[in-house]
Amino acid sequence: MNTTINVNLAGQHYYFDQAAKVKLEIYFEEIKSYFTDESFLQELMTDVEARIAELLNDIRLDSNQVITIQHIENVIQIMCEPNSFKIYEEKTQS
């Protein structure tokens, strides 16, 4: 059984199993690796966290439901892979 971890995401409280938390942290780090502009990155990460929180609220049946790695994989599929963020940055900067 995975350990359950309390996670605060975009000002909202969630219970994550350990594998889900690690998967989400890796996703965030991959996004961050594509950007050098700190102010843009900070704004982007705030928006990404808020959107992920919205998606998780749609997924969970109640506030005590544990978020699993499958939930995070579904969210990432909706959000898109991190390399898509780099393509967006290149288009907006040219």
Residue ranges: model-predicted function:
Residues M1-S94:
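Soluble N-terminal domains of membrane-associated systems
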